[in-house]
Amino acid sequence: MVWMNNSENTPGSLPPGRPLQTEFNDGRDYPRLGNFSFRRGTLTDNQEALWNEHWPKLGKVLADEVIDLPEWFDRDAETIAEIGSGTGTSTAAMAPLEAEKNIVAVELYRPGLAKLLGSVVRGDIHNVRMIRGDGVEVLQRMFAPESLSGVRIYFPDPWPKARHHKRRIVQSGTLHLIASRLKPGGILHIATDHADYAEWIDELVEVEEQLEYLGWPEDQSDIPQLTDRQVITKFEGKGLDKEHIIREYLWRKK
């Protein structure tokens, strides 16, 4: 593999120009970000003050540096990566219900991370950390092999236009990368309310040999506690309002 665009990051900011992107050479499909601009957005004065005070401890920006998770969290515990945490409403609501686990929220959108940061600080939540960057690049560069007990991808952008399907995060290469970061027995949980994206995922459920596809148990007591969303996410709520069918997918690392 080849690293591309190694611009130096500044705290809390992404490097200028094309986003960091690894050129994988393993024959699998990986999301291609393309030449489009991410939503920048602005923070309120209060958000900016909280960001400046708390981000250095609770947040990191995408970098070519593997995280020492026990050091970052000040404890050794099962760690779950949530890829695409958005505004973090459900992340902040779930974290206190699983206080024994470490949660790493990965998101590109700074205002979304700022909202989550505010919820974490005001709620005195101690088990959430944040990384600003593309989910695939964060998995590739910042998590060691077999370092995660779970990965969550809840209601990812469906990129509905056919020419944009290459940007969908659920690809054969992404599943392979996630499998390499999961510990044996670790769980991958994906949820979507987009029918075409569900069909896309259906075609990939058996593609990664390191992952055992579990489907979605009819008996709710069989759902691994590690993956219990417990609260309705923002985009799940929008889907339910439109009477969309929620599809859930579970895999276990062999």
Swiss-Prot record:
Pfam families: Methyltransf_4 (PF02390). One of its GO terms (cellular component) is tRNA methyltransferase complex. It catalyses: guanosine(46) in tRNA + S-adenosyl-L-methionine = N(7)-methylguanosine(46) in tRNA + S-adenosyl-L-homocysteine. S-adenosyl-L-methionine binds at E82, E107, D134, D157. The keyword Nucleotide-binding does not apply. It comes from the Bacteria. Keywords: Methyltransferase, S-adenosyl-L-methionine, Transferase, tRNA processing. Substrate binds at K161, D193, T233, K234, F235, E236. PROSITE patterns: SAM_MT_TRMB. Its EC number is 2.1.1.33. Pathway: tRNA modification; N(7)-methylguanine-tRNA biosynthesis. The active site is at D157. One of its GO terms (molecular function) is tRNA (guanine(46)-N7)-methyltransferase activity. Catalyzes the formation of N(7)-methylguanine at position 46 (m7G46) in tRNA. Belongs to the class I-like SAM-binding methyltransferase superfamily. TrmB family. This is tRNA (guanine-N(7)-)-methyltransferase. It comes from Corynebacterium jeikeium (strain K411).
